[in-house]
Amino acid sequence: DAALNAFGFRMGPYQMSDLAGLDIGWKKGATTANPIRDALCELDRRGQKTGAGNYDYDENRRPIPSDVTAKIIADVTGVEAGGAPGQDEIIATCIYPMINEGLKILEEKMAQRASDIDIVWLNGYGWPADKGGPMLYGDMVGAEAVLATMEKLGAEDDQFAPCATLKRLAADGGHFIDVQP
């Protein structure tokens, strides 16, 4: 969350999950693809409504890093607090898939132009205005950087495989904002 807050989002995904409630879609005793959430919910750490979730919360609902959550993360992942990736890697891992998905939306002709995607993110999802939206941000970091991250993520999980348009932009030195269906 700290990395995405520093990027400019008001909330990171764990803060947002706590706000919505970790138990949405969770069933006691069921095993899901999210063992950290399962463990938190089993301990009745269901987010802000219970005063604890990914974070502990004070009386003003301010998030406080949780030792309980840190232990669960360490137990599930084998990574101790402080052993996590750096801010730049976290941002790339969270943001670059949005850029790749934006290109897929354009490939599927679900949007007319890249700037339409940026407008939705800026006005609908709280994208940081100084970053211009995911497609313009893609131009700020460059298609080659986005492609390298997506190839790495795609090697671990096919859903993150780089789309054809991303490969073309990286090869040709093209710009995300110029892509049209």
Tell me the role of every PLM-derived stretch.
Residues 1-181:
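N-terminal glycine-rich phosphate-binding loop for ADP-containing cofactors
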